[in-house]
Amino acid sequence: MFPSLFRLVVFSKRYIFRSSQRLYTSLKQEQSRMSKIMEDLRSDYVPLIASIDVGTTSSRCILFNRWGQDVSKHQIEYSTSASKGKIGVSGLRRPSTAPARETPNAGDIKTSGKPIFSAEGYAIQETKFLKIEELDLDFHNEPTLKFPKPGWVECHPQKLLVNVVQCLASSLLSLQTINSERVANGLPPYKVICMGIANMRETTILWSRRTGKPIVNYGIVWNDTRTIKIVRDKWQNTSVDRQLQLRQKTGLPLLSTYFSCSKLRWFLDNEPLCTKAYEENDLMFGTVDTWLIYQLTKQKAFVSDVTNASRTGFMNLSTLKYDNELLEFWGIDKNLIHMPEIVSSSQYYGDFGIPDWIMEKLHDSPKTVLRDLVKRNLPIQGCLGDQSASMVGQLAYKPGAAKCTYGTGCFLLYNTGTKKLISQHGALTTLAFWFPHLQEYGGQKPELSKPHFALEGSVAVAGAVVQWLRDNLRLIDKSEDVGPIASTVPDSGGVVFVPAFSGLFAPYWDPDARATIMGMSQFTTASHIARAAVEGVCFQARAILKAMSSDAFGEGSKDRDFLEEISDVTYEKSPLSVLAVDGGMSRSNEVMQIQADILGPCVKVRRSPTAECTALGAAIAANMAFKDVNERPLWKDLHDVKKWVFYNGMEKNEQISPEAHPNLKIFRSESDDAERRKHWKYWEVAVERSKGWLKDIEGEHEQVLENFQ
């Protein structure tokens, strides 16, 4: 009796203590929230930052507040197959000759009879804040994204720009309505203070210095593979020593169709108009960031931030300048082409403006709000490539921190701080971010103001394998079903799925590999295959993270300071290690638990409280461009960002209530060590057997390579 009574007393005390803790935490959070509200009431306005995010399959504008919440937003999903339709979205005029059609009901959005899906395979429904792109006769009914040949991916430069303006106009119109309600209730209105940009990298656009318009009506997108012959010919005629020398300069394996260098060479070799403009010194080269900033600034700023410039294959990582040897390697005469100035990720680029040809297409309402913005000289002052922006938005600032974005593919970045590490294990070296105005403030190190580097690894197929299960095998009805179905079985039943539909990327780098499903038996079910598909993505993320850690403790072991910086966060060295995740597949608790189980107990998987990490990263970059910390509209420094975005205004050592950020979730491994190692061994064997598949197809190798991907 007495032991039971004793346990009851202990339990009651613990319950009361924990309840008191929760109450205290809740009161502190409410106090912090009310303090900020009172501060806002004493202000003439509440500051916001506009973030433009141009992705491979969609564009969006989000107006962020201090908590990293979207006060107003608008998104346009690109169409690739529609043939005609109205352009009423966000205020663009529809040409009188364009046939109009009624907008379908939400849930039944279709283009040419086919459902529309996001890059991660999720069904898209048109809402007030999200529109499906329809086509404009002014652009000959061409969509933003085109696939003219197998392996070819093109974007329409002017339509990219129009989509951005549409999204911004719609966000501002929504903000007008919100502000009217706030003023009526005695609250100060919101006000946009500055703008940042995040964009898909490597995509190459060429335009005329004289007219400011594209030389040809398409840009070559990052995942286009038309340059494979150029790349292979280059490397067959380049010594191994020279290849290593170029790798040291760029951090990139230039034996790849990814980077801008081979795309520029293709334009000059295959497009007479581009060749003519080049010979006449009228050719301007840029990636998407350069194109947008040039067109959207009154000053026609011709710049590229370091995170984008580092993906061209022309920039020297040591100098952060264009390198003559790299330009000469690709046969580019620097005197005949205009290259953008390489700048930091966080500085004033120019004042917001809109080209006249776009302004003429607008209806009165969007035209008015945009003109008001133009009159205010709103500064554009933050820019990051999408993966770097995601890293910043995940607050992965410390050396050794890692983030993984699960989209169509999977991109993992590992922060190496101010140290440039050239990978010996299949990863790329790239710029993470450069915020030059971050000075020592609030105990932060002054090194934060220096350029930061990262190791990067990419998985070719992530969300795309879920689409394949849905559309090709019809194992699932919706992409959201893959997690629950995979979790109906405790493991894959011996099945290993290597999703190498377009070869293997980091750390294997084998374009000749192809997808394989191994280990099936009569015991195998649809659930086993679904789980094996998810595990195939997660195993590749583990392989990349292990490769990056090997680099950090290999080359980095020569530098004691570097080891001390990463010792508390690096993979397989400390239980404090965290992999920050975002993107479509990260929404699934089941998928993220599988990822945590595969990584093991040394790595926690942390899902961000904000769904828009990439756009948030661009907003942070714009905020930090103000040199005076007291002029920064939302956050004084990076610690302040974490305080408000992750801890709801509380200090990080105070406990945060899960209710404050329901999407902030930590996944920890629940797997058995022996089982985890056994499944990893199965994976390694399966990968080896999937490699070189195309090489073994006699007489077909060269033709298949031409259509690779």
UniProtKB/Swiss-Prot annotation:
Region (Disordered): 86-110
Catalytically driven reaction(s): glycerol + ATP = sn-glycerol 3-phosphate + ADP + H(+)
Gene Ontology CC: cytoplasm; mitochondrion
Documented EC number(s): 2.7.1.30
BP term (GO), one: glycerol catabolic process
GO MF term list: ATP binding; glycerol kinase activity
Pathway linked to the protein: Polyol metabolism; glycerol degradation via glycerol kinase pathway; sn-glycerol 3-phosphate from glycerol: step 1/1
Source organism, top-level taxon: Eukaryota
Family: Belongs to the FGGY kinase family.
Function: Key enzyme in the regulation of glycerol uptake and metabolism. Catalyzes the phosphorylation of glycerol to yield sn-glycerol 3-phosphate.
Name of protein: Glycerol kinase
